[in-house]
Swiss-Prot record:
Lineage per the UniProt record: Bacteria, Bacillati, Bacillota, Bacilli, Bacillales
UniProt key word Hydrolase: yes
Gene that specifies this protein: folE2
Catalytic activity: GTP + H2O = 7,8-dihydroneopterin 3'-triphosphate + formate + H(+)
GO BP, one annotated term: tetrahydrofolate biosynthetic process
Molecular functions (GO terms): GTP cyclohydrolase I activity
UniProt site (May be catalytically important): 176
PANTHER family with a match to the protein in the record: GTP CYCLOHYDROLASE MPTA
Family, similarity comment: Belongs to the GTP cyclohydrolase IV family.
Protein's pathway: Cofactor biosynthesis; 7,8-dihydroneopterin triphosphate biosynthesis; 7,8-dihydroneopterin triphosphate from GTP: step 1/1
Protein name in UniProt: GTP cyclohydrolase FolE2
EC annotation from Swiss-Prot or TrEMBL: 3.5.4.16
Gene3D superfamilies attached to this UniProt entry: Urate Oxidase
Amino acid sequence: MTEFDLSTREGRWKHFGSVDPVKGTKPTTKNEMTDLQSTHKNFLFEIEEVGIKNLTYPVLIDQYQTAGLFSFSTSLNKNEKGINMSRILESVEKHYDNGIELEFNTLHQLLRTLQDKMNQNAAGVDVSGKWFFDRYSPVTHIKAVGHADVTYGLAIENHTVTRKELTIQAKVTTLCPCSKEISEYSAHNQRGIVTVKAYLDKNNDVIDDYKNKILDAMEANASSILYPILKRPDEKRVTERAYENPRFVEDLIRLIAADLVEFDWIEGFDIECRNEESIHQHDAFARLKYRK
C-alpha cells in the first residue's frame, strides 16, 4: 500500500482518495474551445425566455442594503442554439460596481446592458427583497425599523417596456366583525397577510413615493397597522383602533381596491388577503383582480 506524506495537504488528500489529474487531449484555452452555445443553424423554434433564477445579490432599497433574489431572462432566436449565461452575471457585476439600487430606472438600465451583451431583442428581470423603513409607534412616537417584502418585475423588447410590475406583501391586524357583533366583550383578532401586485403605467415614470402609497392603502384599511415597538399607551391605541375598525378579509380587500383604483399610474392590480385565523386551524382568504 502506497504511503503518503500526511504532513502535507496534498498527501492527506491522496490518503483520503484524491488522484492526480488525467493528461487530457482537449483544448485548455478559451479561443481553442468549442462554443456550442454559439452554434448557428435552424433550431426550429424561438424561445421567449431563457436565463437564470435564484441569483442572490446585494441591492439597495431606499437607504438600506438587503439581499435581492433575481431571475433574469432574454429571448433566443431560432437560429441560435443557446445563450451565454455567464454574460448575465457579467452584466449584473458591471452594475453592482455602481451599486444596484432597486428602482425601475436602474433595472431598465441593467436590462439594456443585458440586451446588448446577449444580442437579443427582449430581456426581463424579477427581483425580490426586504424593504426596510422607519416606523414610529402611534402615541409615544418611538422609531424602529419595519419591513415588507417587495418584488419588482420589468421586461423590455427592443426599446419598449412590455411589463412593469410591483408586488408588496405586508402584515396587518384584522379584528373579526362577527366576533365583535355577537360577543358581550372583546373579539378575536389575528395577523393578516396582504399581497398587492400592481401593474404600473409602462409609458411613464412612477411617482416618487409609489411604494409608500401602495403600502398605505394596504395598512390603513386594516383593523390596525403592525408596529415593531409598542409602549403601554401605544398598545392601548392599537387595541382600541382595531376594535373600532373590524374587518373581514372581504372588507379589507375591497377597501384596498377602492384606494388603488384612484391611482392613475396603476393600470390594474391583483390583491390577496389571508388571515391566520386565531380561533381556527385554517386560514381565511380573499382574492380580487382589477384591470382599468
